[in-house]
């Protein structure tokens, strides 16, 4: 198949902003430049459009209002305003990205638009990512693929995680053999496990940065625990940690996908700022480690992306608990910040070709499923 240029967009549950990334792929192989040591050069240019505080507030309020959704088309409370904002902000992000990189809409074959998840209840057959793909396509003059989780959920899958097929393709392109773990730590954490035969298992492991960020925002006014410095000064409350790890969703057999709102920072409310940060950070790390009970082979190497890869305390905990080599994605030429945006560019190309986005071992769907809603400009 012909290599095409795709832009991927990701606005995660951490609500920090919009990641933009361009890749070249045919929906199967990925164009890379590989160095002698097996590491790779960046896949393509990237960009970012941060959210202002008032914009974050709107999205938080819309997410709370989303608890009232009973059907996918429902938009109670502030959701209509938030959906318009999400579409507009993503358009701004791409327009700025194109200008910064000397590109025009004609240079891009497709945009993969994830939107903003406001509710994810796969057992109820419900997943909603706000953002209007058709309106985005009209404004940009570029074909857009959006709503990539819905088909999987409609066919009995968890609708998440979606990135494993990209993880596997990137690992193969870079020459990394299994047993390998690829961990993305955003608001939630999800793992892709590739065994020595190339078989793939993927699932959400539990909380990511979400509870830590919420804790820091509430206690300090800061958006995150920079470099894990606050957690590093604290002591883990072992009793609370064991209580948190007893959450039924942590213990559930894959396939499983989780909702950010199922893990609250408020359970640590009686602790000091430092001890709360340490305990919530340990919760994320231990949930990943306990997920290895579901693996056919224990990975000997982990590649970590997402905001959590920049949390030194979390990375240290992971290295100790996983008893394996733990690498920041940036250190091997991958992108810890833009891995998910790159994945949605890749998924958009697969959707155009009718290739599967999800598999029984990634979402629990009964057979491989493609997906996505294609909107022409």
Curated annotation (Swiss-Prot):
Top-rank lineage group of the source organism: Bacteria
Gene3D superfamilies the UniProt entry points to: 3.30.420.40
Positions contributing to ATP binding: 12-19
Membrane spanning residue stretches: none
Catalysed reactions, semicolon-separated: 1,6-anhydro-N-acetyl-beta-muramate + ATP + H2O = N-acetyl-D-muramate 6-phosphate + ADP + H(+)
Pathway given in the UniProt record: Amino-sugar metabolism; 1,6-anhydro-N-acetylmuramate degradation; Cell wall biogenesis; peptidoglycan recycling
GO biological process, one term: amino sugar metabolic process
GO molecular function, one term: ATP binding
Enzyme class: transferase
Pfam families: AnmK
EC number in record: 2.7.1.170
Sorted UniProt keywords: ATP-binding, Carbohydrate metabolism, Kinase, Nucleotide-binding, Transferase
PANTHER family (UniProt xref): ANHYDRO-N-ACETYLMURAMIC ACID KINASE
Function per UniProt: Catalyzes the specific phosphorylation of 1,6-anhydro-N-acetylmuramic acid (anhMurNAc) with the simultaneous cleavage of the 1,6-anhydro ring, generating MurNAc-6-P. Is required for the utilization of anhMurNAc either imported from the medium or derived from its own cell wall murein, and thus plays a role in cell wall recycling.
Family designation: Belongs to the anhydro-N-acetylmuramic acid kinase family.
Protein name as it appears in the record: Anhydro-N-acetylmuramic acid kinase
Gene giving rise to this polypeptide: anmK
